[in-house]
């Protein structure tokens, strides 16, 4: 029985090799056109940095859809450039609930109210 198994395996392998050779000979039309173009223009190929068009567009800078997009991008740049001011206040809010005695006295207004009169 082992002899029969070896024979069937050998037949399967040989048929697989024959099928592969047939597939290699039958080339799709796209592949044949690609081979012709590569033979005609050997210098053309995928460039590592992308296409020239893409590189040129990236060097030009960003284009904006409308003035709103431009203003939003401009505002983001300003926010990044502004240094964050350290808070000078040493008060910590939320430690206790204020009572009327804790609140500072209200300063009198310089302008007299029309309702008080």
Curated annotation (Swiss-Prot):
The modification Phosphothreonine is found at residue 99. InterPro entries: Endosulphine (IPR006760). The modification Phosphoserine is found at residues 28, 67, 109. Residues 1-54, 78-117 are annotated as: Disordered. Changing residue 99 to A: Does not affect phosphorylation by GWL. One of its GO terms (biological process) is cell division. The keyword Phosphoprotein applies. The keyword Cell division applies. GO terms for molecular function: phosphatase inhibitor activity; protein kinase binding; protein phosphatase 2A binding; protein phosphatase inhibitor activity; protein phosphatase regulator activity. Keywords: Cell cycle, Cell division, Cytoplasm, Mitosis, Phosphoprotein, Protein phosphatase inhibitor. Protein phosphatase inhibitor that specifically inhibits protein phosphatase 2A (PP2A) during mitosis. When phosphorylated at Ser-67 during mitosis, specifically interacts with ppp2r2d (PR55-delta) and inhibits its activity, leading to inactivation of PP2A, an essential condition to keep cyclin-B1-CDK1 activity high during M phase. Belongs to the endosulfine family. It comes from the Eukaryota. Residues 1-37 have a biased composition (Basic and acidic residues). It is found in: Cytoplasm. Phosphorylation at Ser-67 by gwl during mitosis is essential for interaction with ppp2r2d (PR55-delta) and subsequent inactivation of PP2A. Phosphorylated by PKA. Interacts (when phosphorylated at Ser-67) with ppp2r2d. GO terms for cellular component: cytoplasm; nucleoplasm. This is cAMP-regulated phosphoprotein 19-A. The gene is arpp19-a. It comes from Xenopus laevis (African clawed frog).
